[in-house]
């Protein structure tokens, strides 16, 4: 049976686009919905061109997230993937999708995780601290920023020329 996933992004959506492309021909996983809290995101055009449903998350209120939860349920979403999504997921969604919300984080957690640690902020901190190794972590989402169980980590050796 095909698992339906929703992708959430706040920026330009490069990870969301890549994940969508990767699963485009999959018989096991279908990208059903892409959501963003950024009305200027190029993801909305991407969704139109690729016949993927999209949703603008208009705010970060309880009502906004309740609407989002209802949309997930109506769309029969099995898993939610956070692809550079900057808003904290509320407990109502976390408890409904326990161990079914996955985050992609740009460091080897627990280093450089937590509130405010995302995107270029993480990379700058890694370079400032003269780290020799960095990488990514894929983990389940729980109530605390970047504290969910780790699913996968991939190390990357940094060169001295990286800035």
Report residues per predicted region.
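One-carbon transfer enzymes
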Residues: 1-163
């Amino acid at each position: 049976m095909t698992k339906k996933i929703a992708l959430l992004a706040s920026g330009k959506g490069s990870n969301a686009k890549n994940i969508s492309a990767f699963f485009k021909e999959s018989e096991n996983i279908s990208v059903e919905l892409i959501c963003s809290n950024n009305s200027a995101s190029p993801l909305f055009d991407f969704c139109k061109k690729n016949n993927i449903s999209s949703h603008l998350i208009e705010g970060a209120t309880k009502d906004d997230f309740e609407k989002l939860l209802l949309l997930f349920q109506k769309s029969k979403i099995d898993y939610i993937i956070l692809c550079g999504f900057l808003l904290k997921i509320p407990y109502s969604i976390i408890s409904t999708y326990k161990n079914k919300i996955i985050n992609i984080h740009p460091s080897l957690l627990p280093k450089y995780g937590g509130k405010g640690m995302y995107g270029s902020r993480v990379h700058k901190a890694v370079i400032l601290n003269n780290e020799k190794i960095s990488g990514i972590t894929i983990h389940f989402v729980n109530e605390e920023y970047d504290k969910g169980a780790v699913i996968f980590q991939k190390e990357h050796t940094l060169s001295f020329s990286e800035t």
